[in-house]
Amino acid sequence: VCKNGYIPKSDTDYCAPNYYGESKVMGEKLVRESDLNCNWSIVRPTSIWGPWFDYSYRTFFKMIDKNRYMHIGKKEFQKPASFVGNTVHMIMKILLDETQMSNKETYYLADYPWYSTKKWAMTIQKTLSAKKIRTAPLWILNLIGFAGDIIKFIMRFDPPLTSSRLKNMQTGGNYPIENTKGICGNLPFKIENAVFKTAHWMYKKDFIKHKPEEIISEK
């Protein structure tokens, strides 16, 4: 219901970037304006990843496995995301809430404490014992992204990096999740365990070549 990076000022502050987003706004408005004879809550998932995921974040893991991923400079980008196991935990907590505090509330589903794209990538690299991830200046990645745009236009092939994908990687935000924390409590999966479970599934499916090893979670 809001474009990537836009932080809403309220539950009804919408900024949909496309027709798909507009359709979700319409769905929320229908729920809010209805006279439902039951309790209801609205959940807004962020970027969900984990076993059985497809395309974008699966490619993220595969690029690190093949040592083709590069950090974007030294800046840390906060990308609200959620491991699917944590997402299910949050939904069930909201769904089975008996306190009434969740009634007519809106919840963002994002892991906490948050992790940057850089930390996420380094956790994947360590779990796979892959080669150390290199850091590239932004101008180099801009050139690669532009080349990807040309390849996509001419060859109808979707390369790993395009200008729009690079922009998306640099866009994040701190979504309001205090009410999510309040009702869901501690999440069951830390990033280290979540990455291992995801990589283990990918290894069994032959999506990656490095056999994952679980690393000890940070305190």
Task: Annotate the PLM regions.
Residues S34, M63, I94, L143:
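Conserved catalytic core of Hanks-type protein kinase domains
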Residues M26-G27, F53-T59, G73-L96, K104-Y108:
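Substrate-positioning beta->alpha
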Residues T59-D65:
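C-terminal beta-strand-loop-alpha-helix "lid" module of Rossmann-like NAD(P)-dependent dehydrogenases
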Residues D97-P160, F189-E192, F196-K219:
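Mid/C-terminal beta-alpha module of Rossmann-like enzyme folds, strongest
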Residues G50, I72-F77, E105-W114, Q125-T127, ...:
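Glycine-rich Rossmann NAD(P)(H)-binding loop
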Residues T117, P160-E178:
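Active-site loop of classical SDR/Rossmann-like NAD(P)-dependent oxidoreductases
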Residues N18, K79-G85, Y115, Y175, ...:
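Residue-level signal for the nucleotide or nucleotide-sugar donor/cofactor binding architecture
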Residues C2-W49, F53, D65, Y69-G73:
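Catalytic helix-loop patch of NAD(P)-dependent Rossmann-fold dehydrogenases
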